[in-house]
Design a protein with these regions (language model features):
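Acetyl-CoA-dependent GNAT
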Residues: 7-70, 75, 110, 125, ...
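Conserved active-site tyrosine of GNAT-family acetyltransferases
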Residues: 23, 116, 121
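Conserved acetyl-CoA-binding loop-helix of GNAT-fold acetyltransferases
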Residues: 80-93, 118
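Conserved short alpha-helix immediately C-terminal to the canonical SAM/SAH-binding motif I
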Residues: 87, 111-112
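Conserved GNAT acetyl-CoA-binding A-motif
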Residues: 95-109
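Conserved catalytic-core motifs of GNAT/GCN5-like acyltransferases
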Residues: 104-106, 122-139
Length: 154
């Protein structure tokens, strides 16, 4: 270990990719030592297409029993037609098939903060970000619907 008296602290506005890459590599090595297999992320996407065009969709990942919804988008022309609800339901069903017990998503106050509670999501955190708005974090415990078959494969 380098003696602390010889450490130099550099503040950089344009760090190299190689220098920045040292950080997640070190963190991942530490995390793996405490939580083996934590990096077993599986992509999950649901798309609504009109012909060859994607007009709505959801993209996220499942890992360690959780579904993370990274993106949910419905084109302006289709909003209000329950397309988002269908995308979320399909993703949650697949997450259950993969053995997930919960889901989480975040949105901004100018996007769809009223949508997720209608689907059973509850707020677990908020940030005053970006200025003049809020970033809101939601979670939900997933439960299989009556009569649905669920296979734990993750």
């Amino acid at each position: 270990m380098t003696a602390s008296s010889r450490l130099r602290f550099d503040i950089e506005d344009a760090p190299s990719d190689a220098d920045v890459e040292v950080l997640p590599n070190g963190l991942e090595a530490f995390n793996e030592s405490k939580w083996p297999g934590h990096q077993q992320w599986r992509p999950l996407a649901v798309f609504a297409r009109d012909g060859e065009s994607i007009v709505a969709g959801l993209a996220g990942e499942t890992y360690s029993g959780w579904l993370f919804i990274r993106y949910l988008w419905v084109s302006d022309a289709l909003r209000g037609r329950r397309i988002g609800r269908k995308l979320m339901g399909d993703a949650e069903a697949r997450a259950l098939e993969r053995g997930c017990h919960s889901a989480w998503v975040d949105t901004f106050s100018f996007q769809a903060p009223g949508f997720y509670p209608k689907l059973g999501y509850e707020v677990f955190g908020e940030l005053d970000y970006p200025p003049g708005h809020r970033r809101i974090f939601f979670r939900k415990h997933l439960e299989a619907k009556a009569g649905a078959q669920v296979y734990a494969s993750e």
